[in-house]
């Protein structure tokens, strides 16, 4: 189960680790779309709206759990790189204890807040009951979502990105089958979609636990490893909490941008919604690079090989930025046809084309600052990732979207460029932070 990422070709390790991670992200995207697609075949608009609103809430929650779990990936990865099996076991056991307690506490809170959350999302009255039912059932599955992401983080910290891909593939297949059963055959509506999702997560967790117990070359856990240790849990949270907060606040910012677009009218709102879906798919590459740099960088830092960790960063930036430049050039020529894949409304296509041409530049800049974020996590400085992302959101993304929407009512192009400008600011902050850390000799955990 454990894979040594501290030897051999750096670029080869990046490719071998990132491709399963990329496919995992793709499957998670497919997993999230399945409920919406299937209920659209069997339910009315209120049912579709309920699942749409509920899935947005669950997407934000899942991203925050994944961000929090980054603390486990990095700390376990550093221990594995240092060949310290006892420390790796201690971090693994404490991670499981910590997240079990947190998930149970959060589940109780979310169940009590299901209806207020649906209200905050401005859910239409016709879809309110379905949305609340969807959220309550999905909230019951929060411990399962947490368990899957923790197990996946443990595997990735060990250098294995393939098994988490298999686990999400199992969940995706089971979810689709159960959706057709509960929504199509049993006509359970949004509640059926939520039940299918939750049971699919349960199956995935069961499979992942079975694999974890039977895998050779893994971490041997003892009862003492699960006993809470303040220093261990504190380090996991110091890395994970900034990433979780960052991901949650970024999603809130995107909701603000959606509100701004909605105020421009139905056509522009539809165009922005479609382009966001396209961009979220293209961002799978930068996202996989972030996670790859975190895992590979952590192992190499733990092994006392900071030069290899830096090489991982530079190679990943080259891949992500190269992809961004390529896709940005292509989109300049095919923006309208790409938008037209999602709608036959000529007005929406005409509005979405310019927005996509501006927004697509974000792929170039995001590819760079995502990789820096992964590196900052690997060296235990995830607060830097939080700072540059939130600064960009507060100073550029949201105000830029508002101002361009107000002063350029005839086109969405400036609004798309405002988003890319936010990522450019993030890149500038990341480069400055990196240079400052290097000048003061703080590119290793605990230095300075």
Regions found by a protein language model. Name each.
Residues 1-18, 76-143, 185-241, 297-362, ...:
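Short alpha-helical transmembrane segments in multi-pass integral membrane proteins
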Residues 7, 11-30, 34, 57-64, ...:
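Residue-level signal for short hydrophobic patches within transmembrane helices
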Residues 16-35, 137, 171, 200-204, ...:
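Transmembrane helical elements of multi-pass membrane transporters/channels
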Residues 21, 25, 37, 74, ...:
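Transmembrane alpha-helix boundary and packing residues in multipass membrane permease domains
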Residues 22, 26, 30, 34, ...:
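Generic alpha-helical transmembrane segments of integral inner-membrane proteins
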Residues 30-49, 118-125, 181-188, 248-281, ...:
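Helix-terminus/linker motif at the lipid-water interface of multi-pass membrane proteins
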Residues 48-108, 145-164, 271-335, 366-385:
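Small-residue-rich hydrophobic transmembrane alpha-helices
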Residues 138-156, 164-172, 193-208, 287-290, ...:
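Short runs within selected transmembrane alpha-helices of multi-pass transporters and secretion channels
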């Amino acid at each position: 189960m454990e894979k040594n990422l501290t030897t051999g070709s750096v670029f080869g390790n990046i490719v071998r680790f990132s491709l399963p991670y990329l496919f995992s992200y793709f499957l998670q995207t497919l997993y999230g779309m399945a409920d919406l697609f299937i209920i659209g075949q069997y339910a009315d608009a209120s049912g579709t709206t309920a699942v749409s609103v509920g899935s947005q809430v669950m997407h934000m929650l899942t991203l925050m759990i994944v961000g929090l779990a980054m603390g486990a990936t990095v700390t376990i990865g550093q221990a594995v790189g240092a060949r310290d099996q006892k420390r790796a076991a201690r971090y693994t056991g404490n991670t499981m204890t910590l997240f079990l307690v947190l998930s149970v506490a959060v589940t109780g809170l979310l169940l009590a807040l299901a209806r207020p959350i649906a209200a905050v999302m401005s859910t239409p009255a016709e879809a309110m009951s379905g949305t609340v039912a969807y959220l309550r059932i999905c909230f019951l599955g929060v411990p399962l979502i947490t368990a899957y992401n923790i197990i996946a983080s443990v595997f990735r910290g060990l250098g294995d990105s393939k098994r988490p891909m298999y686990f999400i593939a199992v969940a995706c297949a089971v979810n689709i089958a159960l959706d057709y059963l509960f929504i199509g055959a049993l006509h359970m509506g949004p509640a059926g979609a939520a039940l299918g999702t939750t049971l699919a997560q349960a199956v995935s967790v069961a499979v992942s636990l079975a694999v974890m117990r039977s895998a050779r070359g893994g971490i041997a856990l003892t009862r003492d490893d699960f006993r809470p240790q303040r220093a261990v849990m504190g380090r996991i949270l110091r890395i994970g909490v900034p990433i979780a907060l960052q991901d949650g606040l970024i999603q809130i910012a995107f909701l603000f941008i959606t509100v701004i677009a909605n105020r421009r009218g139905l056509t522009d709102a539809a165009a922005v919604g479609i382009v966001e879906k396209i961009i979220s798919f293209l961002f799978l590459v930068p996202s996989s690079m972030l996670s790859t740099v975190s895992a590979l960088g952590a192992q190499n830092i733990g092994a006392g090989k900071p030069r290899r960790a830096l090489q991982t960063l530079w190679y990943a930036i080259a891949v992500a930025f190269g992809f961004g430049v390529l896709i940005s050039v292509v989109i300049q020529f095919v923006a309208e046809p790409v938008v037209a894949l999602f709608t036959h409304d000529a007005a929406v296509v005409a509005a979405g084309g310019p927005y996509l041409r501006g927004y697509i530049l974000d792929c170039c800049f995001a590819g760079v600052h995502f990789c820096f974020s992964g590196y900052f996590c690997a060296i235990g400085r995830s607060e830097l990732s939080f700072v540059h992302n939130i600064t960009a959101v507060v100073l550029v993304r949201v105000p830029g979207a508002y101002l361009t929407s107000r002063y350029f009512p005839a086109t969405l192009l400036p609004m798309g460029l405002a988003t890319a400008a936010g990522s450019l600011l993030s890149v500038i902050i990341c480069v400055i932070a990196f240079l400052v850390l290097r000048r003061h000799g703080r590119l290793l955990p605990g230095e300075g």
